[in-house]
């Protein structure tokens, strides 16, 4: 029944900071949901080229509501890359889902609409690592504090020196 044909909605979820900091890896997750029938092909594209390395896709779509005969389906896939590759803002990641509204065995005529075939995708760009962690922040604050104290000490020493020179000049004037 063509009235029950629903194309997928596709979303890409970015890797967690915890995963990146603990494993030096980044896993992007693609989720295709709400489609019926379950005829889809999912692929990952990085910088305009299809990739297979680091990809793990569910073996088949799952029913969102298994109790219903005409339940819509969902499918997930993961792409794992190095943390440094993910942290390059020039890298472009795209999850593409090709959806076939009818199977190859279904026939269609002029009285029946052509098979629904769509490409639905979602994307993400690499995120630059701003370099701030709690440790680097604390080190930066400590360095700034030490630098401030050095500059303050230097300014105080300069003020004492100038005051001493002014005082000596005033004493010499009184002697004349």
UniProtKB/Swiss-Prot annotation:
Residue spans crossing the bilayer: 150-170
Cellular component terms per the entry's GO annotation: alpha-beta T cell receptor complex; membrane; plasma membrane
Location in the cell: Cell membrane
UniProt effect for mutating residue 162 to F: Reduces TR-CD3 complex assembly
Pfam families for this protein: C1-set
Glycosylated sites: 69
Domain Ig-like C1-type: 8-117
Disulfide bonds listed in the record: 30-95
Annotated spans, Connecting peptide: 130-144
InterPro entries per record: Ig-like_dom, Ig-like_dom_sf, Ig-like_fold, Ig_C1-set, Immune_Resp_Modulators
Keyword Membrane: yes
Presence of keyword Transmembrane: yes
Keyword annotations of the record: Adaptive immunity, Cell membrane, Disulfide bond, Glycoprotein, Immunity, Immunoglobulin domain, Membrane, Receptor, T cell receptor, Transmembrane, Transmembrane helix
GO BP term, pick one: immune response
SUPFAM superfamilies: Immunoglobulin
CDD domains in the record: IgC1_TCR_beta
Ranges facing Cytoplasmic side: 171-176
UniProt-listed Gene3D superfamilies: Immunoglobulins
Subunit structure, as described in the record: Alpha-beta TR is a heterodimer composed of an alpha and beta chain; disulfide-linked. The alpha-beta TR is associated with the transmembrane signaling CD3 coreceptor proteins to form the TR-CD3 (TcR or TCR). The assembly of alpha-beta TR heterodimers with CD3 occurs in the endoplasmic reticulum where a single alpha-beta TR heterodimer associates with one CD3D-CD3E heterodimer, one CD3G-CD3E heterodimer and one CD247 homodimer forming a stable octameric structure. CD3D-CD3E and CD3G-CD3E heterodimers preferentially associate with TR alpha and TR beta chains, respectively.
Function: Constant region of T cell receptor (TR) beta chain. Alpha-beta T cell receptors are antigen specific receptors which are essential to the immune response and are present on the cell surface of T lymphocytes. Recognize peptide-major histocompatibility (MH) (pMH) complexes that are displayed by antigen presenting cells (APC), a prerequisite for efficient T cell adaptive immunity against pathogens.
Domains: entry comment: The connecting peptide (CP) domain is essential for signal transmission in response to antigenic stimulation, likely downstream from ZAP70 recruitment. The TM domain mediates the interaction with the CD3 subunits.
Name the UniProt record assigns to this protein: T cell receptor beta constant 1
